[in-house]
């Protein structure tokens, strides 16, 4: 019984330390302001349209938008590689 409890605790700590695997491009460099000077919505946060989302610094390699997240009911901002099939 003890090994099972230890294994569950290890898994729980691993999830807490490593965090959620879907970061929606938050680690990709992006601009924090819109061209009009207003703040933009960071990747992974809720939005209603693409114009609210932060744009990637490298616009040729990465694309951005506001779309439905898998297993979530709301729309969120995302940044992903243009050549990735996971976008």
Swiss-Prot record:
Residues 1-19 form the signal peptide. The keyword ATP-binding does not apply. It is found in: Secreted. Expressed by the venom gland. Disulfide bonds join 40-54, 40-77, 53-66, 80-87. One of its GO terms (molecular function) is ion channel regulator activity. It comes from the Eukaryota. Its main location: secreted. Keywords: Disulfide bond, Ion channel impairing toxin, Knottin, Neurotoxin, Secreted, Signal, Toxin. InterPro entries: Cys_Knot_tox. One of its GO terms (cellular component) is extracellular region. Probable neurotoxin with ion channel impairing activity. The presence of a 'disulfide through disulfide knot' structurally defines this protein as a knottin. Belongs to the neurotoxin 27 (Jztx-72) family. ICK-41 subfamily. This is Toxin ICK-41. It comes from Trittame loki.
